């Protein structure tokens, strides 16, 4: 007689996707992806026809870039910088951070920095060839074309430089184009631009990545020639001179004196390259997940670090410090231009500097920044929120301080003030996606999730989730064009964190009107559009997965009464004829599990979607079609949660997966994927399904060889592999208990020797896998019909029944 399993360790299991899945990405804090286009601000020359034409080109190029991004929304899950890749309108005069007017936005100037010139002996020498200066106005594209025409791509000739003068809108600018240096590691061209000498402050103009392909098309040059082997981009400021170097690999130390000179005056790095070098095309690359923490993002294949824009003060005694910046955060006494500059300085100092984040908190800078969120000035709001976003990155204390509005608070202090700050933040977030980076970081803190659910859930659902998803009008996702995709993606990222807040948080989110409906509608739309790898779909499925956790136990009363009433009546009638085996008899279990589900609503609403057949098919479609590991894991995990238990909902979902939707075919394929987390979740789903007596033979026929194949030949050592092996053994145990034929099939697969090896485990300190293997062996010996077959296969009774296996089996009954 087979040994029955228990509802203990080998019973049903559930999962929930919280921020723990991001542990290998360095932090549970999720940062908002930086804006993909750079703001080119200015004020002069508005009537110039050439300028007007350039402005139109800019608008067209930015529109094409946005469309390009929306066409690859199924790309990577980017964890990028929590600071923008540029500094917004930081026009600073020396000494006191006073704001000034910005140049023309349509000039497309690459940069304007002051105090240009080379130092003898510390930088490049005077070029050996020159071009006569051109006095007429030229666009920067024409100027760059003429400069590049003097370069060649030969690597064996000596260093050669071309120097020329150009006038952009009557302002002189110098371009120096060099071919290469004798060192073979420098195989690419570099462009060094010297700004007009009369400029008094460093002013950066970077070309948006979306403009680069258009630029090289206009130059009739091959983009691949200049980008496919580029590797690394260096931009360094030397006494007000900006050097742009396109090199293959890192800059060798022996050339650093020429380009990254440490002169007597302070050097400010404007743009640092990635620390790793790779040959990258300017086109968007494949499905690799960035391994960076903050500060590095991929934009059209180029590796960028954040822009650090600082003022080169003529008086070293007035150098900006954190203390001075925090003291300037007073909207009543300090000009807004200085406040914006001070907030930007804090943003830069707190970027990847945990000491700076802690110092700002100690200086009481966070409450001052929070007060500035109310200032009706776009520059100030952008700078303040950028500073807050960096301050809370990977710093739970700062997150609590931001939300609750004061330092070292308790749960009873500052609630009202915090709510006010949060509401202001939600309003700002709805106006500009930049502010969503702050919300995303805050949502990763377990201490703040409940407060964010209370304060932000309804606003974000009504203003972002419902409009963008197209529900309830029935539009396809993104069809209405009312919102930018990045806004929807980042809001779903916030809700993904919030949905792991615990039972109370899950109940509130399930009750939120329109939330579940919109998430389901969006995911179904992406599947219909053949976009199962859409990155926002991953967030949506993770939210639904979390909301399905402990669903049966947390159902609202009105649903539990209607669903379980029929089940209670059948169970009462069955108890009258229970045999000597009590409620554990097979007859009673089959009657219990064959209880029909109440008729499904044709138009489900809210929580009803979570167990509806349409959503079950949606999960199976994503398992079959998506190549994103987290999407697969969340879909499998949602089904695992829904099949955990023996009530009407788990039983109905299990029958639907196995018998109606051919779900075993898709699930067994997930046992052989490379991602160990996906494999573990697939085994856990099979473990839950195998608890249904009426489905066991079908499951064994479909998946038995696959389950045996994933059991390792040796004792597993990693936690994930131990969990996977234990679930596989418990699944086999469920399938073997009541079926002599299934046990014989297991013997014929040749997997018994592996199970015995794992059962022995680590001697007197067995792990979960060895315990599960011992339980399985003890159950197999209960099939007396197979004793002779075991002996013919050279197995003895002591291989199945011994002190170790008996102890493991009996422990499940206690």
Swiss-Prot record:
Stored SUPFAM superfamilies: ARM repeat
Which residues are annotated as modified residue Omega-N-methylarginine in the UniProt record? Answer: 46
Q: Which Pfam families match?
A: Arm
Carrying Phosphoserine, the residues are 44, 82, 130
Keyword Ligase recorded: no
Known partners and oligomeric status: Interacts with DSC2. Interacts with JUP. Interacts with KRT5/CK5, KRT8/CK8, KRT14/CK14, KRT18/CK18 and VIM. Interacts (via N-terminus) with MARK3/C-TAK1. Interacts with DSP. Interacts with DSG1, DSG2 and DSG3. Interacts (via N-terminus) with CTNNB1. Interacts with CDH1. Interacts with the RNA polymerase III (Pol III) complex proteins POLR3A/RPC155, POLR3F/RPC39 and POLR3C/RPC82. Interacts with CTNNA3. Interacts (via N-terminus) with SCN5A/Nav1.5. Interacts with ANK3/ANKG and GJA1/CX43.
Q: What does this protein do?
A: A component of desmosome cell-cell junctions which are required for positive regulation of cellular adhesion. Regulates focal adhesion turnover resulting in changes in focal adhesion size, cell adhesion and cell spreading, potentially via transcriptional modulation of beta-integrins. Required to maintain gingival epithelial barrier function. Important component of the desmosome that is also required for localization of desmosome component proteins such as DSC2, DSG2 and JUP to the desmosome cell-cell junction.
- Which terms in the Gene Ontology molecular function aspect does this entry carry? alpha-catenin binding; cadherin binding; DNA binding; intermediate filament binding; molecular adaptor activity; protein kinase C binding
Location(s) in or outside the cell: Nucleus; Cell junction, Desmosome; Cell junction; Cytoplasm
SMART domains cross-referenced by the UniProt entry:
ARM
Signal peptide positions on this chain: none
Give the primary localization class.
nucleus
Name the tissues where it is expressed.
Answer: Expressed in the heart (at protein level).
Question: Upper taxonomic classification of the species?
Answer: Eukaryota, Metazoa, Chordata, Craniata, Vertebrata
The protein in question is named Plakophilin-2
Q: Which family does it belong to?
A: Belongs to the beta-catenin family.
Q: Where are the ARM repeats?
A: 200-240, 309-352, 354-393, 503-549, 604-644, 652-691, 696-737, 740-782
For the keyword Cytoplasm, the answer is yes
Region Required for binding to single-stranded DNA: list its residue ranges: 1-329
Q: Which GO terms describe its biological process?
A: adherens junction maintenance; bundle of His cell-Purkinje myocyte adhesion involved in cell communication; cardiac muscle cell action potential; cardiac muscle cell action potential involved in contraction; cell-cell adhesion; cell-cell signaling; desmosome assembly; desmosome organization
